[in-house]
């Protein structure tokens, strides 16, 4: 335990917390324009073609964002909303596109977990 005199001479140093999603700049979501839509492969031991897109955000950042769900309608110049959240098996992908917002359509024929994929409640 430090004495008061020691604390007067050299105060305690606050820990600096580094953000996992710096491009969002403390906002919940950000809007951007797709510059490239492509597929990439995950790291070992997984195998797939993951759908991702490169996005130029309104604040000037250029980030890679994952497109969740089965099928999508994104292409170059599509305006999308991104949120934080990394994809563990894709290095460098730290953002998710928000389905059902702006130009990104919701997932077709989705029945469960609809809110995460921008799907309205089906008619009974």
Curated annotation (Swiss-Prot):
The modification 3-methylthioaspartic acid is found at residue 89. It comes from the Bacteria. GO terms for molecular function: rRNA binding; structural constituent of ribosome; tRNA binding. One of its GO terms (cellular component) is small ribosomal subunit. GO terms for biological process: response to antibiotic; translation. Gene3D superfamilies: Nucleic acid-binding proteins. Keywords: Antibiotic resistance, Methylation, Ribonucleoprotein, Ribosomal protein, RNA-binding, rRNA-binding, tRNA-binding. Changing residue 81 to V: In streptomycin resistant stra1. With S4 and S5 plays an important role in translational accuracy. Part of the 30S ribosomal subunit. Contacts proteins S8 and S17. May interact with IF1 in the 30S initiation complex. Belongs to the universal ribosomal protein uS12 family. PANTHER family: 30S RIBOSOMAL PROTEIN S12 FAMILY MEMBER. This is Small ribosomal subunit protein uS12. It comes from Haemophilus influenzae (strain ATCC 51907 / DSM 11121 / KW20 / Rd). The gene is rpsL.
């Amino acid at each position: 335990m430090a004495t008061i005199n020691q604390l007067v001479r050299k105060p305690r140093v606050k820990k600096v917390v580094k953000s996992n999603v710096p491009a969002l700049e403390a906002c919940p979501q950000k809007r951007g324009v797709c510059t490239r839509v492509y597929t990439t492969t995950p790291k070992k031991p997984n195998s797939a073609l993951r759908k991702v897109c490169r996005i130029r955000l309104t604040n000037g950042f250029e980030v890679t964002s994952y497109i969740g769900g089965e099928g999508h309608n994104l292409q170059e110049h599509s305006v999308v909303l991104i949120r934080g959240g990394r994809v563990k098996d894709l290095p460098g992908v730290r953002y998710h596109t928000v389905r059902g917002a702006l130009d990104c359509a919701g997932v077709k024929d989705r029945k469960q977990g609809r809110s995460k994929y921008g799907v309205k409640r089906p008619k009974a």
